UniProtKB/Swiss-Prot annotation:
Similarity annotation: Belongs to the ascovirus HvAV ORF17 family.
This protein's name: Uncharacterized protein ORF11
Keywords, in A-Z order: Signal
Residues of the signal peptide: 1-20
Source lineage: Viruses, Varidnaviria, Bamfordvirae, Nucleocytoviricota, Megaviricetes
Organism name: Spodoptera frugiperda ascovirus 1a
Amino acid sequence: MIATLGNLIIPVIFVNYVASETYKLTQRAFDTNFSSTRYDLKNSISRSLYDNPCMGDCVNYTCVVNAFGELEICVTAVDTVRIRHPAAGVLQRDVKYCRGSCVNDTNAPWCIVDTSGSFDLCGPFDAGSKVDSLAYEFLEDRVSFTGRSYGCESGCERTTAPCRVGGTSLPVLCSPIAFVLPPTTPTLKRRTKRNAFVDCFSRNTLLGNNVSSSFIKYLDMFNAEWIDYNVRGHQDDDRIRTIHYGHPYCRR
């Protein structure tokens, strides 16, 4: 399969090359057993509702509790010590910092970068300096900068070209999207839906991966009772929703 960019012909195998290079960088840059002192994030005073210490800040009522990327519900502490780990927020188009441990997931190292729970790939700690994210970017046809697919009629031949649908320009521009894999996905079970979730249907995709997903619109912990729920035993009914912490958009 061939993709075109102006007068250039780009083989789709480039994406596979990018994935391969990302994997190589991941293996070189990170300690898989988290034995390095750069991952020793014990200064946060936040704890999860299950009394586990947070590895970093309590972000959007969620925090990382171990080096495997397990997330648990937590209560935000006003005087939480900010753990800063350099990372570039490619998906957000500006530089952000990790707000928790840099977690080495089975896919790629990632961390939470903002209060909405958005994630990005992270680099090794280097005190006093910023380092680029390990995320690569590549052009994907018919995708706006938000990550939503609008079915652009003209495609994305240039990053400055407007996304056109049926001859009408939408107020967004076609743009590269980051090559980022989603983090470990926790699931939570609650008694009532209230207005906590905005659903994305199972036919949608999240950054190229087929998933059944929901994302948080807002979360009121004090109006709901939460318990752990194993994602491998997930059942999609009115009481159970899969929450994909990490990316605020569902591809449409």
